C-alpha cells in the first residue's frame, strides 16, 4: 500500500495455531506512517523480517531503513524485536536497540520515519474495531467533504490543513461571503471523539452554512454565539458542547469583528510585530443557558495574516513526555513566506517535529487567512 509517496508492502504469513481459538488474544504489529496506521500484521510462529529489500515480510521503502533492518519473533509468548545491524538503528523510548528486546503491548519501536507498534487484540475486538473504523472513515469523509476549498486569488485568501486524529474529533471550519462587503470565518471544536462528536460538528456547520438561526444578524458575532447557544444546549445533545471562534471582516472599513466561546484566541500577524490575540470572554456553546456573548473588533492592516486553529494543533506531547502548548506553538507561525499556499501544512510539519512519534491525540486544524 502507498502513502505519501512511500510504500509499505506486507507479505501475509500463516498465524500460529493459537489463532485457531477465535477469542484468544493475538499479537499484531501495527505499521504507523506520519501518524496513520498503514498496515496491521499478525505475529505468529514465523519470524518476520523488516527492511527495504523486496524479499522481506514487511517491506518499507525509506532510505533510512536498511535492506535487512529488523526481525520480529514470538518467543515464550512475548514479541521480541532485534535490530540486524542496520545502518541507522532501531529505537525504543529514544534508545537504540543493541540486543534482542521484548516489545510490550502498546509500545513501539522506530525505524526511519516508521513506527512498529505491538497490539494485543482478540478476534472479536478486531471485528468490532473494523466496524468502528468503517464508521469513522465514513464520518471523516463526510466532514472533509463539507470543508471549503482554499481561496487562492483576491484580496482575502485562505489556506488550511486538517488532519483528523485516529479517534476522529469534532473539528470543523468554514469561511465565505455574507454579502458584498462582509466575509465570515469560523472554527468549531466539539468536545469528545468519535462519530458522535464528528456528526455534532456537522450539525453546527450546517446551521451556520444555511444561516438557520432565526432573527440573528450573522454580521454580529455576539448574536451568532447567543443563537447557537440557544439551539445547542448540551443536555439536549448528548452532553456535547463546543468551542468556537467566529469573525466577520468588512472590506470597506478593514475592520474585523469577532467573538469566542470557550476558544483560545485567533492570532493576527501584522507588520512583523508580535501577534494580536483576538479573544473575548464567554463559555463554550451549550454549557450555560441564556448566556450573553459580547464581541470585539480590530483593524486589519494590509499584509496581515490571521491564524485560526484547534487545540489539537498545540496541545501535543514532546518526545520527552512534556506537554507542549501555545508558548511552543506561536513561534512556528508567521515568517517571510507565511501567506503563501501550503502555509497551514508547513505548520503541521513543524508541530510533528516537536511532537513524539505516533498519531496526534486530537484533530489538527489550522486555517490561515491572508489580507491584502
What positions do the PLM features span?
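PAS-family sensory domains
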Residues: 114-117, 186-188, 309
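C-terminal catalytic subdomain
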Residues: 17, 225, 296-308, 313-372
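… and, occasionally, acidic/histidine-rich disordered N-termini of signaling adaptors
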Residues: 127-305, 358-372
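Sensory coupling linkers of modular signal transduction proteins
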Residues: 119-129, 192, 314
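Forkhead-associated
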Residues: 39-112
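Intrinsically disordered, low-complexity acidic Ser/Thr-rich regulatory segments
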Residues: 1-61, 73
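Signal-transmission/dimerization alpha-helices at domain junctions
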Residues: 112-122, 206-215, 315-316
Amino acid at each position: 500500500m502507498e502513502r505519501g509517496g512511500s510504500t509499505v508492502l506486507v507479505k501475509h504469513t500463516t498465524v500460529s495455531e493459537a489463532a485457531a481459538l477465535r477469542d484468544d488474544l493475538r499479537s499484531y504489529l501495527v505499521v504507523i506512517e506520519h501518524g496513520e496506521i498503514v498496515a496491521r500484521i499478525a505475529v505468529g510462529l514465523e519470524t518476520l523480517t523488516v527492511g527495504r529489500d523486496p524479499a522481506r515480510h514487511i517491506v518499507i521503502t525509506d532510505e533510512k531503513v536498511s535492506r535487512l533492518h529488523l526481525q520480529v519473533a514470538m518467543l515464550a509468548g512475548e514479541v521480541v524485536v532485534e535490530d540486524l545491524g542496520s545502518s541507522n538503528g532501531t529505537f525504543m523510548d529514544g534508545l537504540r536497540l543493541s540486543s534482542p528486546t521484548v516489545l510490550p503491548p502498546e509500545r513501539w519501536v522506530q525505524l526511519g520515519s516508521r513506527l512498529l507498534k505491538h497490539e494485543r487484540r482478540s478476534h472479536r475486538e478486531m471485528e468490532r474495531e473494523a466496524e468502528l473504523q468503517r464508521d469513522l472513515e465514513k464520518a471523516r469523509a463526510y466532514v472533509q467533504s463539507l470543508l471549503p476549498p482554499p481561496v487562492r486569488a483576491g484580496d482575502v485568501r485562505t489556506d488550511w490543513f486538517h488532519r483528523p486524529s485516529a479517534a476522529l474529533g469534532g473539528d470543523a471550519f468554514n469561511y465565505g461571503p455574507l454579502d458584498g462587503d462582509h466575509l465570515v470565518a469560523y472554527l468549531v471544536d466539539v468536545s469528545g471523539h468519535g462519530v458522535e462528536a464528528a456528526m455534532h460538528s456537522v450539525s453546527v456547520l450546517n446551521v451556520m452554512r444555511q444561516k438557520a438561526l432565526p432573527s440573528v444578524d450573522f454580521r454580529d458575532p455576539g448574536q451568532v454565539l447567543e443563537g447557537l447557544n440557544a439551539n445547542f444546549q448540551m443536555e439536549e445533545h448528548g452532553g456535547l458542547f463546543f468551542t468556537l471562534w467566529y469573525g466577520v471582516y468588512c472590506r470597506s472599513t478593514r475592520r474585523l469583528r469577532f467573538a469566542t466561546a470557550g476558544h483560545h484566541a485567533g492570532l493576527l500577524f501584522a507588520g512583523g510585530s508580535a501577534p494580536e490575540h483576538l479573544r473575548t470572554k464567554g463559555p463554550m456553546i451549550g454549557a450555560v443557558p441564556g448566556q450573553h456573548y459580547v464581541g470585539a473588533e480590530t483593524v486589519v492592516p494590509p499584509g496581515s495574516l490571521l491564524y485560526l486553529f484547534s487545540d489539537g494543533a498545540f496541545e501535543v506531547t514532546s518526545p520527552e513526555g512534556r506537554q507542549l502548548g501555545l508558548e511552543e506553538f506561536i513561534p512556528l507561525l508567521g515568517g517571510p513566506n507565511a501567506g503563501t499556499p501550503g502555509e497551514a501544512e508547513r505548520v503541521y510539519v513543524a508541530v510533528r517535529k516537536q511532537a513524539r512519534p505516533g498519531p496526534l491525540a486530537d484533530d489538527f486544524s489550522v486555517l490561515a487567512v491572508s489580507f491584502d
